[in-house]
Amino acid sequence: NYIDWGTKEDWFNYVRQYKTLFVDLDGTLVKSSGKYTPPYWGETEGIKENIEFLNRLHETGKVYIIITTARHKSAEEKTLKQLKREGIKYDDIIFNLFHANRTIINDYGSSNPYPTCDAVNIVRNTNELERFLKDLGK
């Protein structure tokens, strides 16, 4: 199972092919919804273009998708049904986040000297995701 990675630059080029995406659910993959006012969690339709784009990335095997949401864990069943109904492919999901700013903190060092995290903000309920991430699948 030994793989010769070649030079350090070869290694950098190899690992740059792989990404982990933390993707908010409501307003990004499905139309925005809430717990207390309609439309309620699990009831909204998907944002087709964003779903299709992420599914294509997921199918490459080089993009790991973690869905993030402020939905409570108590909404897990209806959320998972909605994800299945809309055909959303993902690897993991995180519930119970604050409905507030989210920041990713990551390290970098000699084995990965390039920036190791980015942030993308899109307008709620739009199909802009591919425009911001278009180079990921290449």
Model-derived regions, located:
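Conserved alpha/beta core of the MobA/IspD/sugar-nucleotide pyrophosphorylase nucleotidyltransferase superfamily
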Residues: 1-18
